[in-house]
UniProtKB/Swiss-Prot annotation:
Taxonomic lineage of the native organism: Eukaryota, Metazoa, Chordata, Craniata, Vertebrata
Record's compositionally biased regions (Basic residues): 72-82
Subunit structure: Interacts with CYSRT1; the interaction is direct.
Annotated region described as Disordered, given as residue ranges: 1-32, 72-118
Organism encoding this protein: Homo sapiens
Gene: LCE5A
A GO BP annotation: keratinization
GO MF entry, a single one: identical protein binding
Protein name (record): Late cornified envelope protein 5A
InterPro entries assigned: LCE
Compositional bias annotation for Pro residues: 11-32
Further remarks about this protein from its record: Belongs to the LCE cluster present on 1q21.
């Protein structure tokens, strides 16, 4: 064996490339933000319903101006009038069909059973 051959044998082997691939990035994406809350199944009630109810004489829907019906209970009659006839128009302070109404600009446009606006 010549000196040159023995030197080649003593040299460290060339650096091998690693067989394993580098560490993979996680398959899952980063934690997602929480899902949006489920949407309401029914539309939210008009704000007048929060202070007007049957105890305060009853209220018409916001389409009728958000007015209260008269706190005096109507007499039972065979001919029943539609509820909308007892409502005031939006922003109206006039009485219509015996109902007491508040201006929409003053308070929330509804009345207490005593007659005062909310």
């Amino acid at each position: 064996m010549s000196c040159q051959q023995s030197q080649q044998q003593c040299q460290p082997p060339p650096k091998c490339t690693p067989k394993c691939p580098p560490k993979c990035t996680p398959k899952c994406p980063p934690k997602c933000p929480p899902k949006c809350p489920p949407q309401c199944s029914a539309p939210c009630p008009p704000p007048v319903s929060s202070c007007c109810g049957s105890s305060s004489g009853g209220c018409c829907s916001s389409e009728g101006g958000g007015c209260c019906l008269s706190h005096h209970r109507p007499r039972q009659s065979l001919r029943r009038r539609p509820q909308s006839s007892s409502c005031c128009g939006s922003g109206s302070g006039q009485q219509s069909g015996g109902s007491s109404c508040c201006h929409s600009s003053g308070g929330s446009g509804c009345c207490h059973s005593s007659g005062g606006c909310c």
